[in-house]
């Protein structure tokens, strides 16, 4: 039940949940080919999962990282619980539209100045139920981006305002954009897109308790009929907050990466193990920081971190695709702490 189903992916810190999600990025999937010995095993796993074949990408990620700013919405002095829920869902919706456009740009190679060339043609009557004045007729990705950007600004204005301006709270009760971001409704001349999007919400543990409860409730009650993966740290959950087992399998499933032994999904389990063991291979780096430091004596740690930092900074400085991050690279180079320099360089490289 990986496809067209809601899946909660839970793991302890550092077990590789984010690396697992990122393997489905369009840019990463393009690098995984059958004739490359370095990626052949991952390609075969993806092929068996019907994610990619030798000719094209079939499924790819629309990735959204949970930010800490969602917590700003939980202001009981400013908004009622219903209004907080509306703002939370509205913000998630507009950000998933932006994330979808980013995925389409990576699939097509289109830059932001040519987004008008990617057409969006909704074909389902459910478009009439869209909220937040979502575009209901044929338009371009440029139009969608303008809509989402403007709505995000309005939501931020409402969140950051110290005074209520009339009743201008956004009315939103569902994750309505997920089924509307149907890849079949997008087209780009001379380019074949994928068959399905995998919507991903990473670091969901950063949501407040009420927001996480709202997310779970919306996923169950709406029956989204999309592939939606929600990744969160297991250590942030207590037994009373874990998902209700009587609703699992029917409405959603839970995968604990450190315990996943479902024989019915053996191919996905293999995929999990591959990514956990090789989580750095597809991040443009040819050194795994954990392997670099593994089994080293305590007295050697500074030399190991220094070597790692130098390697990653060299990769960053020689990669033409990330020249726009020169200021960040300079800032990392100026970090005095060797360990912090290595980790920050690697983080930017993976990004």
Where are these regions (language model features)?
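Conserved lysine of the Walker
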Residues: 17
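Hydrophobic anchor at the beta1->P-loop junction of P-loop NTPases
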Residues: 9
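Short regulatory helix/loop adjacent to the ATP-binding pocket of P-loop NTPases
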Residues: 237-252
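P-loop NTPase nucleotide-binding core
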Residues: 22-183, 248-351
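Conserved Walker B catalytic segment
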Residues: 164-231
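The conserved Walker
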Residues: 13
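Short glycine-/polar-rich loops that comprise or flank the Walker A/P-loop
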Residues: 4-5, 57-60, 195, 223-227, ...
């Amino acid at each position: 039940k990986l496809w067209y189903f809601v899946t909660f992916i839970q793991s302890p810190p550092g077990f590789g949940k984010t690396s697992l999600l990122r393997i489905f990025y369009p840019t990463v999937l393009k690098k995984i080919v059958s004739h490359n010995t370095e990626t052949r095993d991952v390609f075969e796993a993806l092929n068996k999962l019907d994610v990619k074949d030798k000719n094209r990408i079939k499924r790819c990620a629309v990735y959204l990282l949970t930010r800490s700013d969602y917590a700003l919405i939980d202001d009981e002095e400013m908004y009622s619980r219903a209004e907080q829920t509306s703002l939370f869902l509205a913000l998630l919706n507009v950000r998933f539209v932006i994330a979808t456009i980013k995925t389409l740009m990576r699939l097509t190679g289109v830059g932001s100045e040519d987004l008008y060339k990617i057409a969006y043609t909704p074909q389902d009557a459910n478009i009439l139920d869209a909220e937040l004045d979502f575009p209901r007729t044929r338009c371009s990705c440029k139009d969608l981006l303008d809509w989402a950007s403007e709505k995000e600004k309005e939501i931020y204005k409402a969140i950051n305002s110290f005074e209520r301006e009339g009743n201008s709270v956004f009315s939103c009760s569902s994750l309505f954009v997920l089924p509307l971001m149907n890849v079949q409704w997008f087209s780009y001349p001379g380019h074949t897109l994928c068959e399905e999007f995998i919507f991903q919400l990473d670091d969901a543990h950063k949501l407040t308790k009420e927001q996480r409860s709202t997310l779970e409730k919306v996923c169950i009650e709406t029956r989204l009929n999309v592939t939606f993966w929600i990744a969160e740290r297991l250590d942030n959950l207590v037994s009373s907050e874990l998902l209700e087992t009587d609703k699992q399998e029917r409405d959603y499933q839970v995968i604990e990466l450190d315990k996943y032994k479902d024989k019915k999904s053996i191919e996905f389990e293999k995929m999990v193990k591959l990514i956990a063991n090789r989580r750095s291979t597809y991040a443009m780096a040819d050194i795994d920081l954990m392997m670099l430091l593994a089994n080293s004596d305590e007295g050697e740690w500074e030399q190991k971190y220094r070597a790692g930092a130098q390697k990653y900074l060299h990769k960053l400085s020689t990669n033409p695709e990330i020249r726009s991050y020169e200021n960040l690279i300079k800032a990392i180079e100026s970090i005095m702490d060797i360990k912090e320099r290595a980790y920050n360089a690697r983080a930017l490289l993976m990004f």
